[in-house]
């Protein structure tokens, strides 16, 4: 025992050294070298004005200008969060001299701080709010406020070509850099994150999933982390970075990584920074463009539906009309005609299967607001308006016929089935559109026919404004979107005996009528407040929902499988065009369309279609 005890004590003394963080010595590229032209550094500060997304914040910044910099030409540049990191100015000097990277302008920004009100108060530290957020707020600040301000102040001309712009950061600065490029790939396409905070502080833990669901973006990304990275209340940095790398690889991104045994610091990232820069800017002299899915290896589910097409804006008959338009509602018929109109009634336009847009009919006389538009079983557009006739069928040019006068109009309207049942409308808004629902209020769905105000209605699980409504392809379920929550509600359509005292019972051929039953939340959309709009389905049973994140596409089980980004926020979506194979979105002042491999279903105008069951 006397010989064993000292050995045990000696082992315990060495245990801390066994777990010590490895050293990461800098290479020659990160140290000043003789005979290498040196850039210059400008130091300044910036105070955000009232009206900024970060009002009152003050921040220091530094600007690196490469040797021989020409201010008259648009410059490639790289933005860093948390000021100067990774020995970047020295690395820039050395790599620019070797022509490994272009002559970059370096912009090193500190996070914002609002000064304390007095000596007994704390400042408002904005770093986490600015950096850890997954919203586009920081990219808005950077591109709309900060960069234009320093360009004007220092006489700079930064390139607006996204292939000429990179962005980087460490820890929370890393997630900030990634999100700036994610939201604005039209301005940034090269990203380096060291020990990136892809964890649950302000929602970044959802990014590995969103990377798989969103259509791949044209980004080149390098990630660094280590086994000794943070493991805290909000997540495990080491595991989160690996999940990000796996998701980016799965989605077909141009991605690289460096894993090590380091902790939550900039040591490893600083060591590899010169090689990271070479990788990010490789081929910059011969092929600088970065493309989405460059090797064609992406497993993004959306390629099976929309391919690699792009959105195309429609040209309205008069360009002057578009500036003041709020086109939030669309509908299509089985011929492929797509009808759309201004929210405050003006002419109804039609996009025909031949691709031409023409004025179809004037606005409804006396109407104050158009709430929704659908096509009836004959293919004619039907609108629901307030301040006018209620629900109105619109024919060519001047033929309008009143169909019904509901007590309230709705943003959900669609054609339904045969017989006398031609319309289904979701009733769910207050008389004052801005008045919130109170406790005890309910949203509801009601069936209407041409002869009666209401045939059957059902309350929904939550009180919320209905923003969209459509039938399943087999016409046995109604899908409803509600504006201020992230759920899709399903309502079953069943049959019930027609009441014997119903004066219209003689018109029912089989003694039954449709009834609504078993309403429940069915699908959940991505995003805490996705600002949901209209929705539609295709023959495979996929459900397409217009949201502020883009078009979210759910499978037959209600799961969001992929998200199609849109040029602007879409308020409605439908299939139209030749063979109902084009996807249309209404984005306020613009209607866009995109070719797809799918074939849409228009509610109530086609025989029921039974889709295949959902897969994993």
Feature locations, PLM:
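Short loop/turn segments that connect beta-strands within beta-propeller blades
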Residues: 351-355, 397-401, 449-453, 493-496, ...
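A short loop-to-beta-strand structural motif that recurs across blades of beta-propeller domains
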Residues: 347-349, 390-395, 443-446, 487-489, ...
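Non-catalytic cap/lid and distal C-terminal segments of serine-dependent acyl enzymes
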Residues: 21-293
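Beta-rich, blade/repeat-based domains predominating
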Residues: 317-337, 364-390, 405-430, 439-444, ...
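Beta-strand-rich domains and repeat architectures in extracellular enzymes and scaffolds
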Residues: 296-300, 310-347
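Glycine/small-residue-rich hydrophobic helix-like segments
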Residues: 214-221, 492-572
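Blade-level signature of beta-propeller repeat domains, shared across WD40, Kelch, NHL, RCC1
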Residues: 574-616
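Blade/loop signatures of beta-propeller domains
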Residues: 290-311, 439-440, 499-514, 602-604, ...
């Amino acid at each position: 025992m006397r010989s064993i005890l000292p050995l045990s004590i000696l082992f315990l003394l060495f245990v801390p050294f066994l777990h010590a963080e490895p050293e990461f010595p800098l290479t020659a590229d990160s140290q000043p070298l003789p005979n290498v032209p040196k850039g210059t550094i400008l130091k300044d500060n910036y105070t955000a004005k009232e009206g900024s997304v970060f009002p009152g914040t003050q921040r220091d910044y530094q600007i690196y200008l490469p040797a021989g910099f020409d201010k008259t030409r648009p410059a490639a540049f790289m933005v860093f969060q948390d000021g100067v990191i990774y020995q970047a100015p020295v690395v820039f000097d050395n790599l620019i001299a070797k022509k490994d990277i272009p002559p970059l302008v370096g912009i090193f920004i500190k996070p914002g701080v609002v000064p304390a009100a007095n000596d007994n108060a704390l400042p408002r530290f904005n770093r986490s709010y600015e950096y850890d957020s997954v919203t586009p707020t920081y990219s808005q600040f950077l591109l709309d406020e900060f960069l234009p301000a320093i360009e004007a102040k220092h006489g700079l001309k930064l390139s607006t070509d996204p292939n000429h712009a990179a962005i980087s950061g460490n820890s929370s600065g890393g997630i900030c850099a990634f999100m700036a490029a994610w939201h604005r790939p039209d301005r940034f396409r090269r990203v380096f994150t060291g020990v990136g905070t892809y964890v649950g502080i302000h929602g970044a833990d959802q990014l590995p999933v969103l990377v798989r669901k969103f259509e791949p973006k044209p980004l080149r990304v390098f990630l660094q982390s280590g086994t000794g990275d943070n493991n805290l209340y909000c997540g495990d940095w080491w595991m989160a970075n690996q999940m990000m790398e796996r998701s980016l690889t799965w989605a077909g991104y141009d991605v690289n990584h460096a894993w090590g045994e380091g902790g939550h610091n900039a040591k490893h990232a600083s060591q590899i920074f010169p090689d990271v820069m070479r990788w990010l800017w490789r081929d910059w002299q011969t092929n600088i463009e970065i493309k989405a899915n460059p090797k064609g290896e992406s497993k993004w589910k959306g390629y099976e539906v929309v391919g690699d097409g792009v959105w195309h804006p429609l040209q309205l008959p008069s360009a002057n009309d578009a500036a003041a338009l709020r086109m939030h509602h669309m509908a299509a018929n089985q011929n492929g005609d797509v009808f759309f109109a201004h929210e405050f009634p003006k002419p109804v336009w039609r996009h025909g299967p031949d691709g031409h847009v023409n004025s179809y009919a004037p606005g409804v006389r006396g109407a104050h607001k158009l709430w929704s538009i659908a096509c009836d079983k004959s293919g004619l557009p039907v609108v629901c308006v307030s301040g006018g006739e209620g629900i109105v069928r619109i024919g060519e040019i001047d033929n309008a016929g009143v169909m019904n006068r509901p007590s309230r109009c709705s943003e959900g309207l669609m054609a339904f089935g045969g017989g006398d049942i031609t319309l289904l409308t979701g009733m769910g808004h207050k008389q004052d559109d801005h008045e919130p629902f109170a406790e005890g209020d309910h949203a509801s769905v009601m069936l209407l026919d041409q002869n009666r105000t209401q045939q059957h209605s059902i309350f929904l699980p939550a009180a919320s404004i209905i923003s969209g409504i459509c039938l399943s392809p087999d016409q046995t379920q109604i899908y409803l979107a509600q504006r201020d929550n992230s759920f899709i509600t399903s309502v079953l359509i069943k049959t019930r005996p027609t009441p014997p005292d119903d004066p219209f019972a003689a018109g029912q051929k089989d003694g039954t009528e449709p009834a609504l039953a078993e309403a429940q939340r069915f699908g959940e959309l991505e995003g805490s407040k996705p600002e949901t709009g209209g929705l539609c389905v295709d023959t495979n049973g996929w459900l397409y929902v217009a949201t502020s994140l883009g078009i979210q596409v759910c499978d037959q089980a209600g799961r969001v499988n992929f998200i199609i980004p849109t040029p602007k926020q879409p308020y409605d979506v439908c299939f139209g065009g030749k063979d109902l194979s084009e996807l249309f979105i209404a984005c306020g002042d613009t209607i866009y369309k995109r070719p797809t491999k799918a074939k849409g279903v228009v509610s109530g105008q086609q025989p029921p279609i039974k889709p295949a069951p959902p897969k994993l």
